[in-house]
Amino acid sequence: AAQATLENRCRNGQWDDAIRLLDQQKAASVIERGEAERLKAVLLTAKAGEKLESDPVGAREDAKHALKLAKSLVPAALIAARSYLREDNLRKAATVLEPVWKNDPHPQIAELYVRARSGDTAIDRLKRAERLESLKPNNIESLFAVAQAALDAKEFAKARAKAEAAARIEPRESIFLLMADIEEAETGDQGRVRYWMAQALRAPRDPAWVADGIVSEKWLPVSPVTGRLDAFEWKAPFGQLEGPVEDLTIENAIAAA
């Protein structure tokens, strides 16, 4: 009953009421402390997301409070960083994003971090991507971020090397699509471009925000299917159509190209 009441508040967007109810449940030992803190972080993030446009400073405070309760909550970090970027405070945005990245590298953090300043050159963005790689080396998200930024900067050898390294860690649709983009930009060889596109079709899909069998482009605090709080996870969608990447190993795929 307590859970149903909490979820009802959430479905109606009554975040403050939900937080008060959660605090009461925690005080009465209805809910375990660790779970209560995680759920409160989710509620604070939901509240922050709704007021980012109208009250960016208030949204930032809620998001930072959420991060104290759940230090790897990517959506909270994104909201806090966006609030700082509205004030052109790149340094403070970085201080929010970098610890979360080190703990849980996420492509949405990489995208915001690398493209934080609209006036940056492609080389500036590449340097920022390389900063992320230095914080989390030998990681698929770090390598992908550098590969993408290197392609934009027309540093094709670096782009190709980083994309291949990412593919060796975990072959994914997006990596093979990036390989196709690199091929198109560097050589224009349509045969090779088609080869990488074919690999992308066979590769596992990239992780996404998934809950109760649905995929969302963005994180949501509550499942639209069941009303469950904190339902969304960042993972590969279920039921994906995939086949083995041609030649079974990425080494063979790279060699064949």
Task: Indicate where each model-derived feature is located.
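Inward-facing hydrophobic residues that define packing positions of alpha-helical scaffold repeats
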Residues: 21-23, 63, 80, 97, ...
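TPR alpha-solenoid repeat register
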Residues: 1, 35-36, 76, 109-110, ...
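C-terminal non-catalytic interaction modules
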Residues: 172-257
